[in-house]
Amino acid sequence: MAEAEYFIWTNPEGDFEKEFGNITGMLPTGDYFIPCKRVPITNRQALVVFYALVSLLSLLGNSLVMLVILYRRRTRSVMDVYVLNLAIADLLFSLTLPFLAVSKLKGWIFGTPLCKMVSLLKEFNFFSGILLLACISVDRYLAIVHATRTLARKRYLVKFVCVGIWGLSLILSLPFAIFRQAYKPFRSGTVCYEVLGEATTDFRMTLRGLSHIFGFLLPLLTMLVCYGLTLRMLFKTHMRQKHRAMGVIFAVVLVFLLCCLPYNLVLLSDTLLGAHLIEDTCERRNDIDQALYITEILGFSHSCLNPIIYAFVGQNFRHEFLKILANHGLVRKEVLTHRRVAFHTSLTAIY
């Protein structure tokens, strides 16, 4: 999720890295390029404040989700396991935001080791979070449409599913960590960037392709199909609880699309521009640069919205959280009598 910066190579026999080292978006290719004046990004201080706020809310919200789920070991459901892993992914992603915020103001001042670590952590949890959302949609489809409730088997299998997601996310993220480094290009500040000489463009095109396919298109298609079939099933029923679940499912898909679809569409446009599949003009480059800046903010904010969508709107979650507070003497136990729910449904009822 890098901000696009465009510089022009006017000397094909010159130093490639000096000309292109400061580019963090898709590299242009060829011998000569039309000189484009990059539109400077304003309000960087406001962006830092926003990143800090998102990081704080994500740390707090996802920590509470983890606390509630880990506190109830005996009644933990398959859905709880997915939500727990999703909370871990969002929490780890939020740890990278302070580094990204500082880099917006001062460039990359943390050196190569942290460049690799932050890149790995950010991409790793970006992939795992999206893939977990897709798995949640499949689980809800099976639970509601096909009413599969072999809990013992599902609890056993879900652990392997989550391990598989983490493993695939690690494989997809490793190239970012291996090839990125703190690099100070000619007449510019230090950046955290892949530096492979003339192979940089092809390499980044490959990474972009992986991100488009595994980081958005396949998970989005899975969610739309599974939630679409689930909603169709719910429309045929008249059960109050299932209609409540339908509303939450709609909110989940809507928030995901609002946060992630704009950024991924702009990123796809940037990829097509770098591959010369769409006309390359200075105005278009600057428009994409500004759009990446704005939509990236939406994408990052999704990490702090997940706890609200997946937990805090659930009656069971609120009851379990109050129960923890009551057990530690922080609230009166009489409060729980007004919020008593069926414990065996766990967090599943909110889906």
Curated annotation (Swiss-Prot):
Keywords assigned: Cell membrane, Chemotaxis, Disulfide bond, G-protein coupled receptor, Glycoprotein, Membrane, Receptor, Transducer, Transmembrane, Transmembrane helix
Entry annotated with the keyword Disulfide bond: yes
Pfam families found in the cross-reference section: 7tm_1 (PF00001)
Cysteine pairings via disulfide bonds: 115-192
Compartments where located: Cell membrane
Cytoplasmic side: 72-80, 139-159, 226-247, 314-351
GO terms, biological process: chemotaxis
Function of the molecule: Receptor to interleukin-8, which is a powerful neutrophils chemotactic factor. Binding of IL-8 to the receptor causes activation of neutrophils. This response is mediated via a G-protein that activates a phosphatidylinositol-calcium second messenger system.
Protein name: C-X-C chemokine receptor type 1
Organism: Mus musculus
Gene (UniProt): Cxcr1
